[in-house]
A protein has these predicted regions:
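Short loop segments at secondary-structure junctions
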Residues: 103-107, 117, 126-129, 135, ...
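An extended, acidic
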Residues: 138-262
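Short acidic/glycine-enriched loop/turn segments that link adjacent beta-strands
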Residues: 34, 118, 233-236
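N-terminal subdomain of lithium-sensitive/metallo-dependent phosphomonoesterases centered on the IMPase/IPPase/PAP
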Residues: 1-83, 249, 255, 262
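Residue-level signal for inorganic ion chemistry
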Residues: 16, 42, 53, 86, ...
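Generic detector of well-ordered alpha-helical packing
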Residues: 43, 47, 66, 82-85, ...
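DPxDG-like acidic metal-binding loop motif
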Residues: 72-131
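Solvent-exposed alpha-helices and their adjacent loops that cap or buttress functional pockets
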Residues: 70-72, 105, 123, 141-144, ...
Length: 262
């Protein structure tokens, strides 16, 4: 199964890459807000992926970013983000990827993330580890928050909702780490945690298709995933991916901030 999904992701990614090189601004649209963007390519890529998966695995549910839900109560459900990092895609940046995850009864069992610009194919299956271009992945060995680079998103400051502005958490964490990065693709951020490049990545607002593949890639590489309270109520209560070793330390920082600002 995973070989088919990998080839589907590669095919979709190469198609998207060819479209990026000739992207017409008239093919860019807004979704819920003026800065929540989608392109004709996002939609075409999702249709390509769904078509391939439905032919090979009929009856499986589909949860895609662009065309919504289909048969999601089935035992197996695909979670698809056709271009994770659309803003980067539009502006010619490399930080975007194809993300395809498979859940069985709500539990991730397979994940594939393909970055066509960087030519990196990340993948994982339950119990088989995480891999990139044939090399086994492992999270970073660092034991302290002060030794790692972290990533997050601050898209909240571009939208209408401001109740839970991630900048306040970033300002709490940033002085305590080596450095901060913002890549703009949840799938690639997860893969960076799995690869040992990042010690942690968190978000306040994600959809299941954003991390549908990345969650398993992180955990199979030895990482840990939880909400911002250390429980499994994600993404409703935020979501964080770490190398496991620093998980409790960074959660304590979130807790301390909330305790100070009640």
């Amino acid at each position: 199964m995973i070989e088919f999904v990998k080839q589907t992701a590669i095919r979709a990614g190469l198609f998207a890459l060819s479209e990026q090189r000739r992207l017409d601004t008239s093919a860019i649209y807004s979704k819920q807000t003026a800065k929540d963007l989608v392109t004709d390519t996002d939609r075409a890529v999702e249709q390509l992926i769904v078509s391939e998966l439905e032919k090979r695995f009929p009856g499986y549910g589909i949860y895609g970013e662009e065309f919504g839900h289909s048969n999601t109560n089935s035992e197996y459900c695909w979670l698809i983000d056709p271009i994770d990092g659309t803003a980067s895609f539009i502006h010619g940046l490399p930080n975007w990827a194809i993300s395809i995850g498979l859940h069985k009864n709500g539990v991730p069992v397979l994940g594939v993330v393909y970055s066509p610009v960087m030519n990196k194919l990340y993948y994982a299956e339950t119990g088989k580890g995480s891999w990139c271009n044939g090399e086994k992945l492992s999270v970073s060995p660092y034991q302290k928050l002060s030794d790692v680079i972290v990533s997050t998103g601050i898209a909240c400051i571009r939208s209408e909702w401001t109740e839970e502005n991630n900048l306040k958490f970033l300002s709490r964490i940033a002085p305590k780490v080596v450095d901060f990065r913002k890549y703009g693709s949840a799938a690639l951020d997860c893969c960076s945690v799995a690869s040992g490049q990042l010690g942690a990545y968190w978000e306040l607002k994600l959809e299941p298709y954003d991390y549908g593949a990345g969650e398993l890639i992180v955990t199979e590489a030895g990482g840990r995933v939880s909400d911002l309270y250390g429980k499994n109520n994600y993404p409703e209560h935020g979501i964080i991916f770490t190398n496991s070793s620093i998980h409790n330390e960074i959660l304590q920082e979130f807790y301390d901030y909330k305790a100070l600002h009640r």
